[in-house]
Amino acid sequence: MHAHGALLELTIGRVVKAHGIGGEVVVEIRTDDPASRFCPGNILRAKDFPRGGPERRYTVVYAREHGARLLVRLAGVSDRDAADALRGSLFVIDSLDLPPIDEPDTYYDHQLEGLQVRTMMGRDVGVVAEVLHTAAGELLAVRCDSGEVLVPFVGAIVKLVSLDDGIVEIDPPKGLLDL
């Protein structure tokens, strides 16, 4: 489990490929706030994920929507070769740099991942492996002994989230936990 308040690196985008000849990169968005993360003047930390190179920093010149992705121009990346060299790189931020959430019962994904899941009757179900975002809402992918179970993250099922205790307590409908 992640220690409450522990520093984690969170990926906010991944460079998919170069775009055009002017140095733009196509970025797969992995943040719920791309407008503020990729706003002009922001400094992005880039991890050279596929090649294991050193972390580099880039200043955003501009970003614009490109379907479900962004086209991003970075200072110092002025041609296709320089942009293509970034392919596969991950833009990351530190979890402690995230603004606090003021809404009750709202969490960042990384806060839920690693929490123990149990029923209201005390039966251990497993550990939250991932939070999935679907058109129908959020699902907790819970890793358990018999595989994985998807638990809708809704008040009718998720009765308690305690970050301090590291638990998610659920009241599953009949059949939800049957694999």
Curated annotation (Swiss-Prot):
- For whether the record's keyword set contains rRNA processing, the answer is yes
Q: Which Pfam families does the record associate with it?
A: PRC (PF05239), RimM (PF01782)
Q: Name one GO biological process term.
A: ribosomal small subunit biogenesis
What stretches pass through the bilayer?
Answer: none
- The record places domain PRC barrel at 104-176
User: Does Amino-acid biosynthesis appear among the keywords?
Assistant: no
The record's section on SUPFAM superfamilies has: PRC-barrel domain, Translation proteins
- Comment field on protein domains: The PRC barrel domain binds ribosomal protein uS19.
Stated name of the protein: Ribosome maturation factor RimM
Report the source organism: Mycobacterium leprae (strain TN)
